[in-house]
Regions:
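Enriched for short, Lys/Arg-rich terminal
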Residues: 1, 5, 16, 27, ...
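Short, mixed-charge, low-aromatic patches
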Residues: 4-5, 23-26, 47-50
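Short aromatic/basic micro-patch
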Residues: 8-9, 59
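N-terminal first-folded block
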Residues: 9-42
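Residues that form or immediately flank small-molecule/cofactor binding pockets and catalytic motifs
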Residues: 13, 55, 85
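Generic detector of low-complexity/intrinsically disordered segments
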Residues: 23, 52, 56, 78-81
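A short, surface-exposed loop/turn module that caps and links secondary-structure elements
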Residues: 34-59
Length: 101
C-alpha cells in the first residue's frame, strides 16, 4: 500500500513574509520546511493546533519564528499562511483573521 505524503504551498502573503526576512533566516526556515513538512505523512506531529479565532490552523515553531498553516487532509496539502517572529504572530491575535479557502 502506497503511503500518502503531504505537499506544501505558500499563500501570497506568506511568500511576502519570507521575502521580508533576513536572507539567512529565510534560508533556515525554507530548510526546516523542506526537511520537516514537504513529503511528511503526518504534518500534525511537529505542529500545534491553534485555538480561539485561529482554531483550525496549526503552528510550527522554528526558533523564535512561527509558521502558521492550514492542513487540508482531503487533498494532502499544508498551506502556509504566515511566517513571522513569535512576537508579531501573536501580537494582535484577537484582531487577526485568516480567510479560509
Amino acid at each position: 500500500m502506497e503511503k500518502k505524503c503531504y505537499e506544501v504551498k505558500f499563500t501570497e502573503s506568506a511568500e511576502k513574509d519570507l521575502k521580508k526576512l533576513n536572507k539567512s533566516i529565510a534560508k533556515l526556515l525554507k530548510k526546516w520546511i523542506s526537511e520537516n513538512l514537504i513529503g511528511t505523512q503526518n504534518p500534525k506531529q511537529r505542529g500545534k493546533a491553534l485555538t480561539g479565532n485561529l482554531k483550525g490552523l496549526w503552528r510550527y515553531r522554528v526558533g523564535s519564528y512561527r509558521i502558521v498553516a492550514e492542513i487540508k487532509n482531503d487533498i494532502l496539502l499544508i498551506l502556509i499562511i504566515e511566517i513571522s517572529d513569535r512576537k508579531e504572530t501573536y501580537k494582535d491575535k484577537k484582531r487577526k483573521t485568516y480567510k479560509k479557502k
